[in-house]
Amino acid sequence: MKRRSFINQNSFGLAGALISPKIFEYSKIIDTSRITQNTIPFVLSTWNVPESTQIAADALEKGVSALDASVLGVAYEEKNLKNNSVGNGGAPDRDGNVTLDACVMNHNGNCGAVMAVENIMHVAALAQDVMEKTPHVILAGEGAKKFAIEQGFTPEDLLTESSKKAWKEWLKKGDYHPEINVENHDTIGMLCIDKQGNLSGACTTSGLAYKMHGRVGDSPIIGSGLYIDNNVGGAVATGLGEEVIKTVGSFLIVELMRQGRSPQEACEEAINRILKKHEGKPDFQVGYLATNKKGDIGAYSVVSGFSYTHNKNKINQNTNSNSVY
């Protein structure tokens, strides 16, 4: 009989203090006989999120799968009230509703996504449930919320007082234009490689602040906000989703790596594909982050200000990406 072990909730330390109990359902039974030490666990995330990458890295060290670790890692930012572009406290749409989007993709190419979900904080976890517990890939709106409640997620008001105050200030003018690198964070996209050498990822966001109600960007769209091919590598996107969708950016990057491009070369080409459709310096930001199966990293953005966090050998490092402008 193969040895199996449970990952104890308390073993995640800081995560245990800040993330709801529902999240710890990701610490599933681990088949320890399949765990090897040949691959050093690897975590890569958009923006400066050292707590999230450390939580994911700690989980990987304990044998958690790359998918479970990435969902657990981004859950920290979904709970983090200081991040107003993800989860609880996320900026609302123009009607004052916080609507969340997320997707996940594992090493087998299986994926799940949720769009325009209200009152459910941990939407990356919900996307994983869509992947694992339904015959579908995407659930949206009230249907996704209903499914979440059936799975044990607790509905809650995600509009914080600070987000509400900012929204009311915006209402006085009503001007709508995406802010570049607002507070130096945006969509949280995370890529993990586990001890078995498998690559998976998760992507979560509250979308553009003061968007039209029902707007969905790239984050929950497989191939745009996130794409994984376990034989090649993975990529995630951040920034103005409409521009990412038009070139199916994350899929493009992985396909370029399949053709022999390095992660850096692939990210640069994906940004250039966007810029070819615009004259001069654009007034929006898009950033891409990618890795191949060897752990080589690529990152590139339209304008400066995009950064990423890398955790390897238990060390976090935040790096500013190169950019066109």
Please provide the spans of the model-predicted regions.
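N-terminal secretory signal peptides and thylakoid transit peptides that target proteins
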Residues: 1-15
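Solvent-exposed, well-ordered amphipathic alpha-helical segments
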Residues: 4-5, 21, 75
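Hydrophobic h-region of N-terminal signal peptides that target proteins for export
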Residues: 16-22
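Binding-site signature for planar aromatic cofactors or substrates
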Residues: 23, 27-28
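Alpha/propeptide regions of enzymes that mature by internal proteolysis
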Residues: 11, 29-325
